[in-house]
Curated annotation (Swiss-Prot):
Belongs to the NAD-dependent DNA ligase family. LigA subfamily. This is DNA ligase. Pfam families: BRCT (PF00533), DNA_ligase_aden (PF01653), DNA_ligase_OB (PF03120), DNA_ligase_ZBD (PF03119), HHH_2 (PF12826), HHH_5 (PF14520). It comes from Acidovorax ebreus (strain TPSY) (Diaphorobacter sp. (strain TPSY)). It comes from the Bacteria. SUPFAM superfamilies: BRCT domain, DNA ligase/mRNA capping enzyme, catalytic domain, Nucleic acid-binding proteins, RuvA domain 2-like. The keyword DNA repair applies. It catalyses: NAD(+) + (deoxyribonucleotide)n-3'-hydroxyl + 5'-phospho-(deoxyribonucleotide)m = (deoxyribonucleotide)n+m + AMP + beta-nicotinamide D-nucleotide. SMART domains: BRCT, HhH1, LIGANc. The active site is at K144. GO terms for biological process: DNA repair; DNA replication. One of its GO terms (molecular function) is DNA binding. Its EC number is 6.5.1.2. The gene is ligA.
C-alpha cells in the first residue's frame, strides 16, 4: 500500500502467507470477497482520504493472503480484485475509443485579473436574461488541474474502460494503465447507475514527480520536464508495468454518460451535489471545491487559490467556474462546442519558452559559483524574467544547455526562475499561438491546436559552457572538492561577493562575539564601502559609525566598545570566525588543541592536518587551500596588527586529555553552568559533545526540564550525571551517575 509494497510486485504469486484453505468453494469465495472488500476499504482510506487505519504491514499481509487464495482458486479471480491492478501483457498499440458523450473543452478566460471573473458572470446573466436586481448566480468554483483529462466507464459497478480525451470525440483506450492508479476504484458500491462515466484528471503530485526524476537521474535515464508531461507519458505507455512505477493520482470533476439501473436513480440537481455523490462512491474530489455566489465570490476564490497555489501538492494553472444548477446549465447550452455555463480562469503561466542569449556566472555569499542563463525577456509566473539559474555545471551539462537554445523556463511563486530543459527539434512540443506557453504538439491542455512547433535545429559551432578557473569577482582560484557538484571561489575573506556573510560569521556569538554588529549594520558598512575586509572593523571610528542610518552616538560607542572587547579571544574562536569551509566550532577547537599555535596551523600540510581528531581529507584540503591564498594570510596578519590576540600553547597530545575519546550529550538546564560553558569545558577536556543519544554515548549530563534525551539514556542504560557529576568528571574523579 505504502512504501512497503510496490505495484510491480503485486502480480507475483506469493507463498509467504498460504491461504487458510477453508473447505468448500462457497467458504473460499466468501473469504476472497471479504478480503477484497477489506483491502479496497483500506486502500480508499490511504489513497483517497489520506487517513490510513492500519499499518502497511497489515495491508501487505492481507494482500498476500488474497494473492495466495486466488492462486489456489484461479476461477474465483475477478477483474476488480486489488491483485489485478497490474496486468502482464504489453500492448502493440493504443485502441481508439469514441466517446458516447463528447469530452468538450471549456473556454479559457485569458484575462488573469478579477475582470475575467466579472466578464464570465456578466455573460451568464446576459444569456439568462436576468435583470440587474436579480439575486447572484450560484456557481461551483474548482481548481484547474494541470494533468491529463480522463473518462472512466463503469458498467454494473465495475471499471470496464478508461479513455483519454483525444480530440473530444475520439480518445485512446488506456484501461490497462489507469487500473494501476490506486485512487481510482476498480469497483463501486451497490446502487450506482448501471452505466456511469466519470470524468476527471490524471496528474502527478510535485513530491512524487521530484522523487521520480531523482530515480531517473540515479539510473542515468532521461528526466521529465514537468509533472503534466510525466503523467501524460505514463498514461500512454503500452506496458502497464512501467505505468505502475509512475506515481499517478486522480481527481474527479464531472460525469459523461449515465444510465440509471432503474427508475429513481440519482438525480443530482446541482453540480455540487454531483461532486458530493462522487465522493460517496469513492472518487477523490479536490478539497478546494466550493460554492460561490456571484462574481465577487468567484474573484475571492481566484485570489485565495492563487495565493495558495505554490503550497498545493500538485500543479494547477487556473480555476474553473461552473453554474451550479444543472437546469440552468441545460438552459445556457453550448456555443461552438464549448459550454456557456463554464469557464477556465487562468493564472499567469509558470512555465514559458524563450531563448538563451548567454550564460553568466554569479558568485554567492558563500563563494558558490552558479551558472545563470541570460534570456530573451519572457513573462512567466507574473513577472518578466531575463535570467534563470542553471544550478551548477553538472546540471547544466545534464540538460545540455547552450547559447542560442530554446529552453523551458519555470518560475513558481518566490522561487528563483530556473531552466527546466532544452526544447529539442522534433520533441513534439509547441507554443500556443500568441503566447509562449508550452503544450504538447498533438493537443494542448484545453483541446486547442497550437500554431508554433518547437524547436529549430541548434546553431552550429556553439561551444559547451566551461566554468572559469578564476573567480569573476576577485580573481581567486576556483575549486571543486571531490564528491561536490558545486564550484567555489577560494577567496574567502578577500572576495567582495562573500564579504557580508564573512563579517556576520566573524562577529557571531560563538566566534568573535561582537555585540551589536547585526545584519542591518553590516549591510550599511559593506554596501557603503565603509569596510572592505575584516580588519577594517577594528579601524572604525566614532564619526564613521555615527553617520550611518539609525546609529546615534551612544549606539556607535557601544559597537566600538564591543569591538575592543572582542580583540581578546581564543585561538579556537578566531579560527572558527575566519569562516574556513567545513571548519565548524568543534573542528576549530580540535585544531587549536592539536597545534596550539596559529602559525603551526597555517603552515601545516594536508598530511599534518589529517592527524587532527575528526579531520578528514575534505576538511584538511579546505584548511590547506584557505591558508595557501596570500590574501587570506594577509587578512590574518592585519587582524593581529589591529590587536586581536589569544593565548597560545604547546601542541596537546589528545591521548593525555582526561575525556579523550568520550562522547557526552547535554540536556536540560544546569543550575550554574550555561550550555555553551559546559560544552566548552567538555571539549577542552577532549570530549566530543553530541546532539543525540546513542549506544556510543558515554555520559548524558541532565539538568532541569530534561526531555527525550534523558529518557533515551535511561532506556539504553547510559550513565546520567547532574552538574556536580559533570564537575567531578572534568576533575578526573569518579562521577556519581544517576543525577538529574
Amino acid at each position: 500500500m505504502g512504501p512497503g509494497l510496490t505495484l510491480s510486485g503485486m502480480t507475483e504469486q506469493s507463498s509467504l502467507f498460504p491461504a487458510p484453505a477453508p473447505k468448500g468453494s462457497a467458504l473460499v469465495a466468501a473469504k476472497i470477497k471479504a478480503l477484497r472488500e477489506q483491502l479496497n476499504r483500506w486502500a480508499h482510506e490511504y489513497y483517497v482520504q489520506d487517513t490510513p487505519s492500519v499499518p502497511d504491514a497489515e495491508y501487505d499481509r492481507a494482500f498476500q493472503e488474497l494473492q495466495a487464495l486466488e492462486g489456489a482458486y484461479p476461477d474465483l479471480v475477478t477483474p476488480d480484485s486489488p491483485t489485478q491492478r497490474v496486468l502482464g501483457a504489453v500492448l502493440d498499440g493504443l485502441t481508439p475509443v469514441r466517446h458516447r458523450v463528447p469530452m468538450l473543452s471549456i473556454r479559457t478566460e485569458t484575462d488573469t485579473e478579477a475582470s475575467g471573473a466579472q466578464a464570465f458572470d456578466a455573460r451568464v446573466r446576459r444569456e439568462l436574461k436576468l435583470p440587474p436586481d436579480a439575486p447572484p448566480v450560484e456557481y461551483v468554483a474548482e481548481p484547474k488541474f494541470d494533468g491529463l483529462a480522463m473518462s472512466l466507464r463503469y458498467e454494473g459497478g465495475r471499471l470496464v474502460q478508461a479513455a483519454t480525451r483525444g480530440d473530444g470525440e475520439v480518445g485512446e483506450d488506456v484501461t490497462h494503465n489507469v487500473r494501476t492508479i490506486r485512487q481510482i476504484p476498480l469497483s463501486l458500491p451497490a446502487g450506482v447507475p448501471r452505466v456511469l462515466e466519470v470524468r476527471g484528471e490524471v496528474y502527478m503530485r510535485r513530491a512524487d514527480f521530484d522523487a521520480l526524476n531523482e530515480r531517473q537521474r540515479e539510473k542515468g535515464d532521461k528526466t521529465f520536464v514537468n509533472p503534466r508531461n510525466a503523467a501524460a507519458g505514463a498514461v500512454r505507455q503500452l506496458d502497464s508495468g512501467i505505468t505502475a512505477q509512475r506515481p499517478l493520482s486522480f481527481f474527479a470533476y464531472g460525469l459523461g454518460e449515465v444510465t440509471p439501473a432503474a427508475e429513481g436513480g440519482p438525480d443530482f440537481g446541482t453540480h455540487f451535489g454531483m461532486l458530493q455523490q462522487l465522493k460517496e462512491w469513492g472518487f477523490p474530489v479536490a478539497a478546494q471545491v466550493q460554492i460561490a455566489q456571484g462574481a465577487s465570490e468567484l474573484i475571492a476564490f481566484h485570489q485565495r487559490v492563487g495565493a495558495e497555489r505554490d503550497a498545493l501538492p500538485y500543479d494547477i494553472d487556473g480555476v474553473v467556474y461552473k453554474v451550479n444548477s444543472l437546469a440552468l446549465q441545460r438552459q445556457l447550452g453550448f456555443v461552438t462546442r464549448e459550454p456557456r455555463w463554464a469557464v477556465a480562469h487562468k493564472y499567469p503561466a509558470q512555465e514559458m519558452v524563450t531563448r538563451v542569449e548567454g550564460i553568466d556566472v554569479q558568485v554567492g555569499r558563500t563563494g558558490k559559483l552558479t551558472p545563470v542563463a541570460r534570456l530573451a525577456p519572457v513573462f512567466v509566473g507574473g513577472v518578466t524574467v531575463t535570467n534563470a539559474t542553471l544550478h551548477n555545471l553538472f546540471e547544466l551539462r545534464r540538460k545540455k544547455v547552450r547559447v542560442g537554445d530554446q529552453v523551458i523556463v519555470r518560475r513558481a511563486g518566490d522561487v528563483i526562475p530556473e531552466v527546466v530543459g532544452v526544447v529539442p527539434a522534433g520533441a513534439g512540443l509547441a507554443v500556443l499561438a500568441g503566447s509562449d506557453a508550452l503544450v504538447d504538439a498533438a493537443s494542448s491542455a484545453d483541446g486547442t491546436a497550437p500554431a508554433q512547433p518547437l524547436a529549430g535545429p541548434r546553431q552550429p559551432y556553439v561551444p559547451n559552457f566551461r566554468m572559469p578557473r578564476q573567480c569573476p569577482i576577485c580573481g581567486s582560484a576556483v575549486v571543486r572538492e571531490p564528491g561536490e557538484v558545486n564550484h567555489r571561489c577560494s577567496g574567502g575573506l578577500f572576495c567582495p561577493a562573500q564579504r557580508k556573510q564573512a563579517v556576520l560569521h566573524f562577529a557571531q556569538r560563538r566566534a568573535m562575539d561582537i555585540e551589536g554588529l547585526g545584519e542591518k549594520l553590516v549591510d550599511q558598512l559593506v554596501e557603503g564601502h565603509v569596510i572592505r575586509t575584516l580588519p577594517d572593523l577594528y579601524r572604525l571610528g566614532l564619526s564613521s559609525l555615527a553617520q550611518l542610518d539609525r546609529m546615534a552616538e551612544k549606539s556607535a560607542q557601544n559597537v566600538l566598545d564591543a569591538l575592543d572587547k572582542s580583540k581578546r579571544t581564543t585561538l579556537a574562536r578566531f579560527l572558527f570566525g575566519l569562516g574556513i569551509r567545513h571548519v565548524g566550532e568543534a573542528t576549530a577547537k580540535d585544531l587549536a588543541r592539536h597545534f596550539g599555535r596559529l602559525d603551526a596551523i597555517m603552515d601545516a600540510g594536508v598530511e599534518q592536518l589529517l592527524q587532527v581528531n575528526d579531520v578528514g581529507p575534505v576538511v584538511a584540503e579546505a584548511i590547506h587551500t584557505f591558508f595557501a591564498q596570500p590574501h587570506n594570510r594577509e587578512v590574518v596578519e592585519q587582524l593581529r596588527a589591529c590587536g586581536v590576540t589569544w593565548d597560545e600553547s604547546e601542541p596537546a597530545a589528545a591521548a593525555t586529555l582526561p575525556l579523550a575519546g568520550m562522547t557526552v550529550v547535554l540536556t536540560g538546564t544546569l543550575p550554574t553552568l550555561g550550555r555553551d560553558a559546559a560544552k566548552d569545558l567538555l571539549e577542552s577536556a577532549g570530549a566530543k559533545v553530541a546532539g543525540s543519544v546513542s549506544k556510543k554515548t558515554h555520559y548524558v549530563v541532565a539538568g532541569a526540564d530534561a526531555g527525550s534525551k534523558l529518557a533515551k539514556a535511561q532506556e539504553l542504560g547510559i550513565p546520567v550525571l547532574d552538574e556536580d557529576g559533570l564537575r567531578a568528571l572534568l576533575r578526573g574523579a569518579p562521577p556519581n551517575a544517576g543525577g538529574g
